[in-house]
Amino acid sequence: MPTRPARSGLHSLAQLLRSDVVGGFLLIGGALTALIWANSPFGHVYEALRSFSFGPEALHLHLTVEAWVADGLLAIFFFVVGNELKQEFVHGELRNPRRAMLPIVAAVCGMAVPALIYAAFNAGDPARLPGWGIPMATDIAFAVAILAVVGRHLPSPLRTFLLTLAIVDDLGAIIVIAVFYTASLSFLPLIGAGMLLAVFGYLQRGRGVAARLNSAALPNWVVYLPLAGVIWALVHASGVHATIAGVAMGLLMRTVPLAGEKESPSHRLAHLLGPWSSGLVLPVFAVMSAGVVFAGGLGAVLDDTAALGIIAGLVVGKTVGIAGGSWVTTKLTAAELSPALRWIDITGMALLAGIGFTVSLLITDLSFPDYPEALVHAKAGVLLASLLATVLGAVVLAVRNAHYRKLRQAVSPQ
């Protein structure tokens, strides 16, 4: 048993890791470590680690370390995000359908405009045109981390807007992968996953059989952990990106405590998994995903229309699609922007949405299997666009953060 000082130390560490700012710095540190390592003389060690495979072959889970992190470990982060969104839909900003509609429409516009921009750059090149899906995706982990680091005083609805937008964006990108970039989709595992998700949702209700289960001597994790593992494995086997399993289970969590409960399962798991998500999952993910090698120099990258289309799509297309699409939507429909936000806030957030790593790099691999030069340049383009979007978004949001800090100090000078 841990001693009292040890327990106190672990509690303090957990509290520290629950901070989005601390998690953001850890993730950025992981990304910088990966970039330096991959482009150093020891880059072959980094690549060997990422490509090392393990897992049961019979279950089609003999995966590389990189895949285990991107598909498996990151599902924990997506569960935490889905769970947080569920709380917002039930108790928070997204209870208002007119406000919930706006980030959803923004996500759709933020996928369409970058794809069109990329297609315009590469319309005359059949070898590079298949990469139109690359600039569609927002890397939610990096975007939320940067927002946390630069925007401690920004209104909370901005983070909710970004979370909702990024989840819809990821879902859209995964549908694009399934329809346009996947040779075959296995529907039987997908149906099985859907049925088990229904069981998961039923158990969350805490009535009937679920109530008897909750009152049994067995701890809940004995049931939920294997169930979650099987759901994840089935989604993975279907060909759909397995992190969707995490989002789905997070959205099914019960956010209202039953009679006799001190807190709901949603709040309990948010408290438990938050430190693991920010302190372990995101930094490890950054180390495994951000190691892009700059081969051939920057000039060769910027001479390639695939890289230029990606950079323009992620930096310009995302901003125009999200901010412009949101503004037009508020003028033409009943959708409305939160009173706590201004359009410059949405513009800064839209710039951050131009950060593309995981899904963008995945689509890059699927787009150019027979064109290694385009593949290398496109990956470098994703990285350059993400760095540019980070800097521009951080500058805009840092200015807005200072503005909101002054407003709060004026209201409560102490």
From Swiss-Prot:
Set out the biological process GO terms recorded for this chain's protein.
regulation of pH
Record's superkingdom?
Bacteria
GO terms (molecular function) for this protein are:
sodium:proton antiporter activity
Q: Where, per UniProt, does this protein localize?
A: Cell membrane
- Residue ranges spanning the membrane: these are 22-42, 61-81, 101-121, 131-151, 171-191, 215-235, 239-259, 281-301, 308-328, 343-363, 379-399
List, alphabetically, the InterPro entries matched.
Na/H_antiporter_dom_sf, NhaA
User: Which UniProt keywords are listed?
Assistant: Antiport, Cell membrane, Ion transport, Membrane, Sodium, Sodium transport, Transmembrane, Transmembrane helix, Transport
Catalytic activity annotation: Na(+)(in) + 2 H(+)(out) = Na(+)(out) + 2 H(+)(in)
Task: Give me the Gene Ontology terms describing cellular component.
Answer: plasma membrane
Q: How does it sit in the membrane?
A: Multi-pass membrane protein
Gene3D superfamilies linked: Na+/H+ antiporter like domain
- Where does the record locate the signal sequence feature? none
The UniProt similarity line reads: Belongs to the NhaA Na(+)/H(+) (TC 2.A.33) antiporter family.
Q: What does this protein do?
A: Na(+)/H(+) antiporter that extrudes sodium in exchange for external protons.
Looking up PANTHER family in the UniProt record yields:
NA(+)_H(+) ANTIPORTER NHAA, SODIUM ION/PROTON ANTIPORTER NHAA-RELATED
- Identification of the protein by name: Na(+)/H(+) antiporter NhaA
Q: Which organism is it from?
A: Thermobifida fusca (strain YX)
Gene behind this protein: nhaA
